[in-house]
UniProtKB/Swiss-Prot annotation:
NCBIfam families: sec62
Region (Disordered): 225-273
Organism lineage string: Eukaryota, Fungi, Dikarya, Ascomycota, Taphrinomycotina
Xref: Pfam families: Sec62
Record-given protein name: Translocation protein sec62
Recorded GO CC terms: endoplasmic reticulum; membrane; Sec62/Sec63 complex
One of the protein's GO biological processes: post-translational protein targeting to membrane, translocation
The protein's assembly and partners: Component of the heterotetrameric Sec62/63complex composed of sec62, sec63, sec66 and sec72. The Sec62/63 complex associates with the Sec61 complex to form the Sec complex.
Domain of life from the UniProt record: Eukaryota
Amino acid sequence: MDSSNVPVLKDEDKCKFSMRFTNFLKSRPELKTKPAILNGKRVYYFRVKRVLRFLTSEAYTPKKYKGFPEISSREEAIEVLKLLIMNSMLVRVDKLPPKQRKQKLVELQINRNQDFQDDMHYVWLYEPLPKRVMALAVLFALVVLALVLFPLWPMFMRKGAWYLSMGGLGVIGLFFVLVILRFFLFCITAVIVRPGIWLFPNLLADVGFCDSFKPLWSWHNSKSEVKKTRKSKKLSKKATSPAASATPEKSSTSTTSLKNLRHRNPTVEEVSE
């Protein structure tokens, strides 16, 4: 990148510029970022040609943003991306072959050779804290402060807090009662009506609150599990059938040989003295 277009920045200013420029690029739809998995974490990656095409096009308007450099060539855009790499904003990755046929997210692997060819892929490493998380942190701090000042609360607020705590304990108690009741119901129906019925089958599943109570009931084995068991039984029968068919053939050959021995005509053999 030409030094006339970009001012000389200190280390702190370079870091701030990298964060601002990264947030700007992440918000641009021209990059067409896609979700993927890198080291077990969900990340977003993009192609080099898309970011270079955007930075050298008319869609990139640096005059609207203070401190953004003017970019007129591919080399200048690459220099800006190198600055982002030096500040750990992005890193080059390679796609791994899929482990399954229908894999939802692509798995990535870091490539140490930080080059900028058109078909190469890069991942955003910089993830700023969302405003929602910061708001929740402030709210949590205020709640803790309010609990610490509980002795200074007026009497009506203390009574309200006591009623709320009792209501929360009641909800937790009802949840445990529901878990015990559905277990007893399953044990009874497993004996009377096999394979058994579960009340609120998704109650303990890793789903949302509303989905935990859908459906109202279901059988112990789902349709997919029943199909799998049937297929396994069919495969086991097919595997055992050749061995079973092979044994009668052996027995039939042995019986035919015995019959031939029985119906053979008597013969006289000469014995040399």
